[in-house]
Amino acid sequence: MKSTGTFRYGAHVLANGIRQHYLRYGGAEAGPPLILVPGITSPAATWGFVGERFGRTFDTYVLDVRGRGLSASGPDLDYSLDTCAKDVVALAQALRLQPYLLVGHSLGGRIAIRAARIDRQIEKLVIVDAPLSGPGRPPYPSPLDRYLTAIRLARRGASLEELRPFTPTWTEEHLRVRAEWLHTCDETAITQSHHGLQTDDIHADLAAVQQKVLFIVAGKGPLSAEAIDEVRRIAPAVLIRVVPNAGHMIPMEDIEGFMAAFDDFLGKRLDG
């Protein structure tokens, strides 16, 4: 993908008892620290093009959530929402990033909500099309088998055409990066995370968050109007913005709309 020259390096840090891997963009001279947490089967490298853009304005750290990419993985690790949220907080502490901004997409958005509830060093929170499933609510619409099938195909070296049906709206460029990294997603991690999408009460977390919150919604995504209305009821201070022409993987489908949705919420406009 076209580089803007903000990539600094990839690195590991021991935090919350595991090896955590991240990609850094921008550096301290770019602006305040910002941690970006991708979704359920999105290693950090698949969000590198977003990191490149964020790195123009912020000291950006794109995280490999445990069980993905180059972070620690394996069947014996705990992949619960609580633990993943503590990973983010521990990463920020280990890298001395406090205070910091936090952005999370999909599952990463749920991780970010839980992290914001436990860490007041998070100044502002941006949730990007996070699933609003949970106890007493409609189930998460994407079945676990779909994720595991794609991972197994990638593990055996599937072609782009074999993987394309899972992300049919993506460009070949985005699909190539996903094909390169999808095999790193640990099946135990994905299974536990998917289960948590049905059982974790993220609404209680969101209602308790004290920081300023922006919720970016995909206009063509899975979140219903009723689900968004519930967010407005339980957390009326949350600012909601819609990217009308994008599905759930918003930046892969409309990067300019994604960037524009932030406006000046983070204190500075993202340099488009």
Task: Locate each region found by the language model.
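Conserved loop-alpha-helix segment in the C-terminal half of the alpha/beta-hydrolase fold
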Residues: 213-246
